Swiss-Prot record:
SUPFAM superfamilies: Carbohydrate phosphatase. One of its GO terms (cellular component) is cytosol. GO terms for biological process: fructose 1,6-bisphosphate metabolic process; fructose 6-phosphate metabolic process; fructose metabolic process; gluconeogenesis; reductive pentose-phosphate cycle; sucrose biosynthetic process. The lineage of its organism: Bacteria, Pseudomonadati, Chlorobiota, Chlorobiia, Chlorobiales. It holds the Pfam family FBPase. Mg(2+) 2 binds at residues 113, 116, 278. HAMAP family: FBPase_class1. This is Fructose-1,6-bisphosphatase class 1. The gene is fbp. Its cofactor is Mg(2+). Homotetramer.
Length: 333
């Protein structure tokens, strides 16, 4: 692998290898990469620019909005929408669908979480942007509506995330493997650093907020107890790694192997993570890397969405670990 392969060069190679991926799709991903550079610039200087802390409002989820959330949301809408490739967008921060600039010429749908893990911004923990891309169903950009956004995850044509941490990485898939790029600030480019990412079939870590233990159902509790039991034959006990930033926890488990668990609870019976712009894109990436993603009963990518901000339980990561989680959730163990 050439460490100096830029994201643009990689996309050109991808088109040659897979003719069904047209230049428009790679242009969409380039737009996302450009927007990520803008967000990254503010994330790394947030404490100096006075855009930390709360903005004094709540989003559609009822969550307090951080100033940087609003900044990231605006930057993504304007930077990605300016080229007229998207007819409609949906964001965690907006209750209704968004008609971006120049939407009249758009043929695609973008769903995104502008800054996942934003509650960690003030303490310098990794945060990220998650995105999902679909083709427009209605065919006519001026007629684009909520129905265009409510497509199954299996219909995604591209998905990815950007993690803003000790380094900045963009990880994406178009259904032809998973590839990661690290931002080199000396040249201002994303360079190919992780080609054809695959996740181990068995992991060694589990990521869950065990502070919610009393809210978990019996199946979830039994699964977590299973992971903590000592059994050299199955590589147990697993170690806990939980940051509280979905992008960061998922990224680590993707590379090292493990399972991320955000189950249904007594308080959140439908789960807490959002299906359309959190679970679906990460499930697409995970499956392309050889992993698995379910709600405990169904494949995430097969769920028929009913709402833009629909929530779901999520078990995602190494294939065998998720299969075992499903067995406990379904009462088979």
């Amino acid at each position: 692998m050439n460490k100096l392969t830029t994201i643009e060069s990689h996309f050109l190679q991808l088109q040659k290898r897979y003719p069904e991926i047209n230049s428009e799709v790679t242009d969409l991903l380039n737009d996302v990469a450009f927007a990520a550079k803008l967000v990254r610039r503010e994330v790394v200087r947030a404490g100096l620019a006075d855009i930390l802390g709360l903005a004094g409002s709540t989003n559609v989820q009822g969550e307090e909005v951080k100033k940087l959330d609003l900044f990231a949301n605006e930057r993504l809408i304007n930077a990605i929408g300016q080229h007229g490739r998207f007819a409609i967008m949906g964001s965690e921060e907006n209750e209704e669908i968004i008609k971006p600039p120049k939407f009249e010429s758009g043929e695609y749908v973008l769903l995104f979480d502008p800054l996942d893990g934003s509650s960690n911004i003030d303490v310098n923990v990794s945060v990220g942007t998650i995105f999902s891309i679909y083709r427009l169903k209605s065919g006519e950009p001026s007629q684009a509506s909520l129905e265009d956004c409510l497509q199954k995850g299996a219909d995604q044509i591209a998905a990815g995330y950007v993690i803003y941490g000790s380094s900045v990485m963009m990880v994406y898939t178009t259904g032809h493997g998973v590839h990661g790029f690290t931002y080199d600030q000396t040249v201002g480019e994303f360079l190919l650093s992780h080609e054809n990412i695959t996740t181990p079939e068995h992991g060694k870590y589990y990521s869950v907020n065990e502070g919610s233990w009393q809210e978990f159902n019996d199946g979830t509790k039994r699964f977590l107890d299973y992971l903590k039991e000592e059994d050299k034959a199955t590589g147990r006990p697993y170690s806990t790694r939980y940051i509280g930033s979905f992008v960061a926890d998922f990224h680590r488990n993707l590379l090292t192997g493990g399972v991320f668990v955000y189950p249904a609870t007594k308080k959140h019976k439908n789960g807490k993570l959002r299906l359309m712009y959190e679970a679906n894109p990460m499930a697409f990436i995970c499956e392309q890397a050889g992993g698995r993603a379910t709600d405990g009963y169904r494949r995430i990518l097969d769920i028929e969405p009913k709402e833009l901000h629909q929530r779901t339980p999520l078990y995602i990561g190494s294939k065998n670990d998720v299969l075992i989680a499903e067995e406990f959730e379904q009462g088979k163990r």
